[in-house]
Amino acid sequence: MSEQKAAEVNQLIEDISQKLNMLNIGVIKAEDFSPDKYEDIEFLHQMVMKKSSFSPSEMQAIASELKNLRK
């Protein structure tokens, strides 16, 4: 993964983490994601940033999706 892509993925993951107040998201690092998953991560990021609040089940689904997007 290029350094720029890695930085972008890292920022997207960090933004999602902060928006959801996920404390354990630190175990997910940019290098855990393949460059071909960037668009999926970006889509998830856009969805998360648009919403003002999340139900516990939505938060679980987002965490699960992040897990699925890992290499």
From Swiss-Prot:
Domain of life, source organism: Bacteria
Short name of any one Pfam family annotated for the protein: DUF1128
InterPro entries: UPF0435 (IPR009507)
HAMAP family in the cross-refs: UPF0435
UniProt family annotation: Belongs to the UPF0435 family.
Protein name, UniProt field: UPF0435 protein BPUM_0734
